[in-house]
Amino acid sequence: MERHQQDLSELTTRLRGNHRRVTGPRQLILNLLRREEHPASAREIHEKLGDLCNLATVYRSLHLLESMRMVKRFDFGDGSARYELLGRDDDGHHHHLICQECRKVVEISDCFPHTLEERIAHRHNFSNVTHQLEFFGICPSCQPA
């Protein structure tokens, strides 16, 4: 996906373009999210960064990056938000299939609810209608033999 192909200089340029400082922790978080295959929680990011960045700074940075539409937040139903890097022109729209046992995440690019969004928006006179949909199941590795 596009988000994994962005280099750190492009991401820091986006920060500067939004009149935000390019701090060490922000660079570390962006660089880590560039390499992640799946959305990561603030705690997972903090654990991977270790003493390089405290947990409160991770949360503040993720909140800022989300407000700038550089990351997207996902809720997998376990009480822990997860974050994924967005590309410059990426709306981040895709879904996930999550194993209820091992928490393995598979990215799903198919999206059928777009036409439903249009009908709902028209029927209720809403604009900018969107959705967030995640699928849950048991992966082959966790299924009983």
Enumerate the language-model features and the residues they cover.
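Short, leucine-enriched amphipathic alpha-helices that occur as contiguous helical runs
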Residues: 8, 25-26
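A short acidic, leucine-rich amphipathic alpha-helix
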Residues: 44-49
